[in-house]
From Swiss-Prot:
Coiled coil: none annotated. This is UPF0522 protein B. Glycans are attached at N148, N245, N333, N345, N370, N423, N432, N495. Keywords: Glycoprotein, Secreted, Signal. Residues 1-19 form the signal peptide.
Length: 517
C-alpha cells in the first residue's frame, strides 16, 4: 500500500482508475487468539513427552563424600519416570499453573558405605526411591503470563512436587552378609536433591519452550503495510489469557484476549496509540464454540484503529493536476467536460487552468459487523478545490464534504500452508456529497455522487497477508461473520511431523447468547 491508495477517495470522485471464566471474563478488545481444547490435548501429550525426555536425560553423576564420619559412594544412577494427567489452571490475574496430577518415578543407584570406629566397616548394595502404589504425587509449575503493549511473556518461575507422608518410599537392599550401618539420613539427602533436580528440570524445560507458546498466542505483532511516510503499524498486545468458562474438557480451550488496537510508530521512533477504546465484549458462545484447532476473532475496534493509524497521519494531502494519469476520463482542469458540466461559472471565470485539490484529515467511520457484511458508517473527508493561476497562485473556488457509508465482504484465503490473507470486496457504497461553500456560483453535487456510484466496481481494497505461527502449517481454513465479530478458523499441522494429531470439522455458533451459570 502506498500514497496512491490514500488518493483513492478523490480518485473515485474523478472516476480515475488507480492501481493499487464466567460471563464477562472476556474483556473488550480488538483481537482474540483462541486455541481449542482438542488441539491442546494433542499438544499436551507432545509436551508431556518432551518434559519426560528432558528429565530422563538429566545428568545424574556419581556422588561421594563424608557425612558425620560416614564415607559414602553412590554410583550407577538409573531413573524411570512417567508423567500423567496434564493440567493447567488460572490462579489469578496473569498467574497460571501447569503440571501433572500424577507423577511416578523409580530412582535406583548402587551404594558403598564405610564407617571407621574401632575397625573399618563397609557395606554395599542398592537404594531405590520410588512413588508408592496408590499414593498421590503431583508436579506443578507456576507461570507468570504478561501481555504488555508490544510483547507476550510467559515464564515458569517455580515448580513443586507436593506429596503426603508415605507417598515416596526409600528402600535399601544390602548385598553383604552383615548390614549394620544406618544410612537413612544420607538417603533422604540424596532423595531431596533428586526432587530438586526434577523440579528445576521441569522449570527449565518449560522456559525453553516458552517462546513457541508465546508465538501461538501472539502470532501477529505487526501489520504488513508500507506507506510513503515510512510509518510502521503494530498491534497493541496488552491483554490476558482466558480459560473457557464452561468446559468439561481438560485441558480447556484457552484464548489470548488482547487490546488489538493499532499502534503507529512514526519515523522518529515515537509511538502513537489509538484514541478509540474497545467497547464490544464477546459472549462465551462466540468465543468457545469453534471446533477447529485455532480461531482468530476480530472486532470492529481493530478495523477502526487500523483505518485511524494508516489514513489520518497521511493527511492533509494535496493533489496536483500532474498526478492524474493522462488516460483518465476526468482531468483536473476547469475546462474538462466534468467540471464544465457541474460548475459552468468556474469554467467561464477561469478557463483552461489547472485545479488543485486539498484533502483534510478524514473522520474515521464507525465499524459494525453482522452475518452479511462489515459496515462502515459516517466516513467523512473534507476537500477544497483551488484554481492554479499563471502566477502559481492557488485561489479557492469551492469546498466539498464527502460522507460515505459502505458495506464490505471479507474472504479468507491461504496463499500457502504458512500464510493466509484477508481479502475484502466492496459490496456497496452510499455517498452523500455536500457543497459547503462556493466562490463560483452553483456547483452540482450530484455529479460527484454519480461518479462515485459508477466507480464502485473499480474500487480495490488491498489485501493483507499474515503468517501463521512458524512451527505450524494450516489447513481447513474458514471465515465467517457473526454478531459484531469476524472469525477465522483453521487447523494446524506441526511442520516437524507434517501430521495432524487431531482434526475436527468447523462448526461455528455465532449467536449472541449468554450461557446460564
Amino acid at each position: 500500500m502506498n500514497k496512491t491508495i490514500i488518493l483513492l477517495l478523490i480518485s473515485i470522485i474523478f472516476e480515475i482508475v488507480i492501481s493499487s471464566s464466567v460471563d464477562g471474563n472476556y474483556p473488550a478488545g480488538g483481537l482474540y487468539f483462541g486455541v481449542s481444547s482438542n488441539f491442546l490435548v494433542g499438544e499436551s501429550e507432545k509436551f508431556t513427552q518432551y518434559v519426560q525426555d528432558e528429565l530422563l536425560a538429566m545428568d545424574l553423576p556419581d556422588q561421594s563424600g563424608d557425612s558425620d564420619g560416614v564415607q559414602y559412594s553412590f554410583t550407577h544412577f538409573k531413573l524411570a519416570l512417567n508423567l500423567q494427567d496434564f493440567f493447567y489452571a488460572q490462579l489469578g490475574p496473569g498467574v497460571f499453573q501447569m503440571g501433572w496430577d500424577t507423577i511416578t518415578f523409580n530412582l535406583q543407584w548402587e551404594y558403598e558405605i564405610c564407617v571407621k570406629k574401632v575397625v573399618k566397616l563397609c557395606e554395599s548394595g542398592t537404594i531405590t526411591v520410588y512413588t508408592a502404589s496408590g499414593q498421590s504425587v503431583s508436579l506443578g509449575t507456576t507461570l507468570d503470563v504478561l501481555f504488555n503493549s508490544s510483547n507476550a511473556k510467559i515464564e515458569a518461575t517455580s515448580t513443586v512436587m507436593p506429596f503426603e507422608a508415605g507417598a515416596v518410599v526409600a528402600s535399601v537392599h544390602c548385598t553383604d552378609s552383615v548390614c549394620l550401618i544406618p544410612i537413612n539420613d544420607i538417603v533422604s539427602e540424596v532423595s531431596s536433591q533428586f526432587v530438586s533436580q526434577v523440579t528445576n528440570g521441569v522449570t527449565k524445560a518449560i522456559n525453553d519452550k516458552a517462546p513457541s507458546i508465546e508465538q501461538l498466542f501472539t502470532p501477529i505483532k505487526q501489520i504488513p503495510i508500507t506507506m510513503d511516510s515510512g510509518n510502521q503499524y503494530w498491534i497493541d498486545l496488552e491483554g490476558c489469557l482466558v480459560e473457557a468458562n464452561y468446559s468439561s474438557n481438560s485441558p480447556s480451550t484457552i484464548t489470548a484476549a488482547i487490546n488489538g488496537g493499532i499502534v503507529l510508530e512514526n519515523t522518529d521512533g515515537n509511538f502513537v496509540y489509538p484514541t478509540q477504546t474497545p467497547s464490544y465484549v464477546p459472549y462465551d458462545s462466540q468465543m468457545e464454540s469453534f471446533t477447529s484447532d485455532y480461531c482468530i476473532t476480530i472486532t470492529g475496534y481493530f478495523i477502526e484503529t487500523l483505518l485511524d493509524a494508516v489514513l489520518v497521519p497521511e493527511f492533509p494531502m494535496t493533489i496536483q493536476p500532474s498526478q492524474i494519469p493522462a488516460s483518465s476520463p476526468v482531468q483536473l482542469n476547469t475546462s474538462s467536460d466534468f467540471f464544465s458540466g457541474i460548475a459552468p461559472n468556474l469554467t467561464s471565470k477561469y478557463p483552461n487552468v489547472g485545479i488543485q485539490v486539498n484533502l483534510m484529515p478524514p473522520t474515521i467511520p464507525t465499524v459494525t459487523i453482522n452475518s452479511s457484511a462489515i459496515i462502515l458508517t459516517d466516513f467523512e473527508i473534507s476537500t477544497s478545490f483551488l484554481v492554479l493561476t499563471d502566477n502559481d497562485d492557488a485561489i479557492p473556488v469551492f469546498n466539498v464534504l464527502f460522507k460515505f457509508d459502505a458495506e464490505i465482504q471479507t474472504t479468507l484465503y491461504t496463499d500457502s500452508v504458512s500464510v493466509f490473507s484477508l481479502n475484502s470486496t466492496l459490496l456497496s457504497i452510499t455517498p452523500n456529497v455536500t457543497i459547503t461553500d462556493s466562490n463560483v456560483g452553483s456547483v452540482d453535487a450530484t455529479g460527484f455522487v454519480q461518479l462515485i456510484e459508477m466507480a464502485q466496481s473499480i474500487i480495490k481494497i488491498p489485501s493483507i497477508t499474515y503468517p501463521v505461527p512458524s512451527k505450524y502449517s494450516i489447513t481447513n481454513v474458514n471465515s465467517q461473520l457473526g454478531d459484531q465479530i469476524i472469525q477465522l478458523t483453521f487447523d494446524l499441522i506441526e511442520n516437524s511431523t507434517n501430521q495432524k494429531y487431531l482434526k475436527k470439522s468447523v462448526n461455528l455458533n455465532l449467536k449472541k447468547k449468554k450461557k446460564k451459570k
